[in-house]
């Protein structure tokens, strides 16, 4: 899970990409909500914002704009 705009968002489905990068862990590195990890990249596929229904990434990003280079907590 991560926190964004004071809301907890659970990651329900994701894919791990074994790729080198230079970003700080937790940084959003693409418009499709790919998140830099300490090692590799997490490509989020399905998530759920607190008190909301689960959404695939396309549905979620239509209503929530998490900008590239945002550092998630």
Curated annotation (Swiss-Prot):
Keyword field contains Transport: no
Keywords: Protein biosynthesis, Transferase
SUPFAM superfamilies linked: FMT C-terminal domain-like
Gene Ontology MF annotations: methionyl-tRNA formyltransferase activity
Function: Attaches a formyl group to the free amino group of methionyl-tRNA(fMet). The formyl group appears to play a dual role in the initiator identity of N-formylmethionyl-tRNA by promoting its recognition by IF2 and preventing the misappropriation of this tRNA by the elongation apparatus.
Stated family: Belongs to the Fmt family.
Stated name of the protein: Methionyl-tRNA formyltransferase
Species of origin: Rickettsia amblyommatis
Lineage, top ranks: Bacteria, Pseudomonadati, Pseudomonadota, Alphaproteobacteria, Rickettsiales
